Amino acid sequence: MSLLQFQQVGYWYKNKSQPLFQDINISFQKGKFYTIVGTSGTGKTTFLSLAGGLDAPKEGNILYDGKAVSKIGLTNFRNQYVSIVFQAYNLLPYMTALQNVTTAMEITGSKEKNKESYALDMLQKVGINEKQARQKVLTLSGGQQQRVSITRAFCCDTDLIVADEPTGNLDEDTSKEIVRLFQDLAHKEDKCVIMVTHDEQIAKVSDINIRLSRGSFTVKENVAVV
């Protein structure tokens, strides 16, 4: 069964006669790494906002594990069922980087016994050392904050992870490591990962690439993922 399903989803900003999306039907499964690409104005971030419960469709339904997200409630859905990595970071500025991660783990019911140790290990994997992990996030650079946001998503006990350009502020080596971690989440942890990216190289190593154009989309399954 699909983890997330769009059923005849339509969305528009001001006028129904000029929809951004119309009659979108697509399913997302656990164990898969999806990328979404498209030119500016095709609705990539809006699509991801719908998938992550940050916005609701104007028409149609979005189902999570067979249940309508509208019935679950957007706030409850975001808090309990999805981990979100957006460019705005959405971190708690007066908490430390470590506290941001462990608090999210508590909220989503992580079963890790030593949450602090696990979070520190994951932060180090994305280039945040222990000293930085114990600093308030408002003292960290934009790129460092992005790494904390990514780590928070990695550590939360949710089956769905949505990410908007998560490697945008990172150097090439760190970007490759982040993509590898997203792949591992999908393939080794059986998560559903949906990532918006402008990087065609990342799109090539995803399992399924969704290319948006105005009002429509195409889906390509990548046979060999390196």
Swiss-Prot record:
Residues given in the record as ATP binding sites: G38, T39, S40, G41, T42, G43, K44, T45
Residues in the signal sequence: none
Domain of life of the organism encoding this protein: Bacteria
GO cellular component: plasma membrane
Domain ABC transporter span(s) in chain numbering: 4-226
Any GO molecular function: ATP binding
SMART domains according to UniProt: AAA
Any single GO BP term: transmembrane transport
Swiss-Prot/TrEMBL keywords: ATP-binding, Nucleotide-binding, Transport
A Pfam match: ABC_tran
UniProt xrefs under PANTHER family: IMPORT ATP-BINDING PROTEIN, LIPOPROTEIN-RELEASING SYSTEM ATP-BINDING PROTEIN LOLD
Family membership: Belongs to the ABC transporter superfamily.
Protein name: Uncharacterized ABC transporter ATP-binding protein YclH
Gene: yclH
